A protein has these predicted regions:
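A short Gly-Trp-Pro
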Residues: 1-137
Length: 137
């Protein structure tokens, strides 16, 4: 089964054809900056199961960090579409709100970087929570 998504203005479109390897909320400060304050609700999709079908996103990578992530976004409307992280090679971290059907994959299965969680962030009942990423000190 395939799922489609796009940026807000529709200039950049994509398709996913692989099942997610994770379904999460990320509460790290970096994601809060990108989202405007909310946790990042995301899916980890194998790279081979993701492709852009229209448009070409712009990429941003902070130069002042060691091993920074790459963030891909629409140059027209600014919608953040996905992240590529050195710590997760072969995976694109897709922003669920950009899917045509954001509810297609149900509730997140885990919440990560809860050490940065804000008092107004909500983690659904029963979701596994980690102060950092699973397996990281």
């Amino acid at each position: 089964m395939t799922h489609q998504g796009r940026c807000y203005c529709g200039a950049v479109r994509y398709e996913i054809s692989s099942a997610p390897v994770f379904n999460a909320q990320c509460h790290c400060r970096e994601c809060q900056y990108i989202s405007g304050g909310s946790p990042n609700v995301c899916l980890g999709i194998p790279e081979q199961g993701f492709r852009y079908t229209a448009g070409k996103p712009k990429t941003y990578r902070r130069t002042d960090l060691d091993n920074p992530v790459s963030r891909e976004f629409c140059g027209g409307c600014g919608t953040h579409l996905l992240t590529r992280a050195p710590a997760a090679p072969g995976i694109v971290i897709l922003k669920r709100g950009t899917l045509d059907d954001p509810a297609a994959f149900g509730n997140p299965q885990l919440a990560i970087f809860t050490c940065d969680q804000q008092p107004f962030h909500h983690i659904p009942e029963g979701v596994m929570s980690f102060e950092r990423a699973p397996g990281k000190p």
